[in-house]
Swiss-Prot record:
Name of the protein: 1-deoxy-D-xylulose 5-phosphate reductoisomerase
Key words, A-Z: Isoprene biosynthesis, Manganese, Metal-binding, NADP, Oxidoreductase
UniProt-annotated binding residues for NADPH: T10, G11, S12, I13, G36, N122, E124, G203
Binding positions (Mn(2+)): D148, E150, E219
């Protein structure tokens, strides 16, 4: 039986993970849960899964949780340090890293240092500090298993093949809700329109990132670190049906792809069960019913966030950390209706242009770039 700690248990990935766990009580047990926004839902999760320890956002949330709990009272931590304690606790075999944004970096690093295998949904961990995290994974001999559907697809399509036989990897993108929207119309996009993704049900931040195509940009950087692939060997193709989750092209011209219904429970179940497979509960594909699969080139003029991500990856140093931090601030401002849709990428670009990059070594040097970019982005927004 595999003992799990879930960071971000009340979010979209956390809920899907618990649904997979619920289907396989003989395979998985919950040792720890961490969340930041929904204490009431966490209380219900604690009553069902009986974890030994949990973490909440702050001290006030600790008090609120204590009043909601019944007879089962786990050890309660709070803050990022609390999430790190959950992730590195004795008895945990695997950590599902699903905290949104750069906030997931510290707990994930703590888990790796404690020798825990990682099911990674928090792509920002590799975007912000890819080299540091990759080095730690090797040093502590842990598995870093992708939960993102695209990276899970690449991981599965690479299985059994030699790295030197890979020509390139191809990430698919749905194109988001504005795939056919003109550049002029994008300036007037509303928050409500941006939150309506055509294929996936996700949290607000990643839904906006999908609409700007920044999510695909972050996934390009994540793929670079997960698969040791240079930017020149990472392609993106728009695939509106979201049935092919990604592909690997080999030097002989053959392409291997992974297909499935657009449901995060499939890549989650694969990461939790690897190297085996488990029933995920998703709808099985009916290819005749789907009928047609289509593909398009991404438009980096209308969606400059994707271009900025490729530029950050190629430039290296602290640019990816700055890209991510500025984007988090800009998306939050858009969600608060303080800036327009096209201002998101514009804010990121201005912040990157203002940055004097350096070569980070220690974790705090990565976090320093993150903090700088957040403050600079706020100034541009103000």
């Amino acid at each position: 039986m595999r003992s799990l700690a879930i960071l971000g248990s009340t979010g979209s990935i956390g809920l899907s993970t618990l649904d997979v766990v619920r289907q396989h009580p003989e395979k998985f047990k919950i040792a720890g849960l961490a969340e930041g926004h929904d204490v009431a839902l966490l209380a219900e999760q604690i009553k069902e899964f009986l974890p030994a320890a949990v973490s909440v956002r702050d001290a006030d949330s600790v008090k609120k949780l204590q009043t909601l709990l019944g007879s089962h009272k786990p050890e309660i931590f709070h803050g990022l340090e609390g999430a790190a304690a959950i992730a590195s606790a004795e008895g945990v075999d695997m950590v599902v890293s699903a905290i949104v944004g750069a906030a997931g970096l510290l707990p994930t690093v703590s888990a790796i240092k404690a020798g825990k295998h990682i099911a990674l949904a928090n792509k920002e961990t590799l975007v912000v500090a890819g080299k540091l995290v990759s080095d730690l994974v090797k040093k502590h001999n842990v598995h870093l298993l992708p939960v993102d559907s695209e990276h899970s697809a690449i991981f599965q399509s690479l299985a059994g093949h030699r790295a030197e036989d890979v020509e390139r990897i191809i990430l698919t993108a749905s194109g988001g809700p504005f795939r056919n929207t003109s550049a002029e119309e994008l300036k007037n996009v509303t928050l409500e329109q941006a939150l309506k993704h055509p294929q996936w049900t996700m949290g607000a931040k990643i839904t906006i990132d999908s609409a700007t195509m920044m999510n695909k940009g972050l996934e390009v950087i994540e793929a670079h670190w997960l698969f040791s692939m240079p930017a020149e060997k990472i392609g993106v193709v728009v695939h509106p049906q979201s049935i092919i989750h990604s592909m690997v092209e080999y030097i002989d011209g053959c392409v291997i792809a992974q297909l499935g219904s657009p449901d995060m429970r499939a890549p989650i179940a694969y990461a939790l069960s690897w190297p085996e497979r488990s029933e995920s509960g998703i709808h099985k594909l009916d290819l005749p019913k789907i009928g047609t699969l289509t593909f398009e080139e991404p438009d980096m003029e209308r969606f400059p966030a994707l271009r900025l991500a490729f530029e950050a990856l190629k430039a290296g140093l602290t640019y990816p950390a700055v890209l991510n931090a500025a984007n988090e601030i800009a998306v939050a401002a858009f969600l608060d209706r303080k800036i327009g849709f096209t201002d998101i990428a514009a804010t990121v670009e201005k912040t990157m242009q203002a940055h004097e990059a350096y070569d980070p070594i220690e974790l705090d040097e990565y976090l320093q770039a993150d903090r700088w970019a957040r403050e600079m982005a706020k100034k541009f927004i103000a």
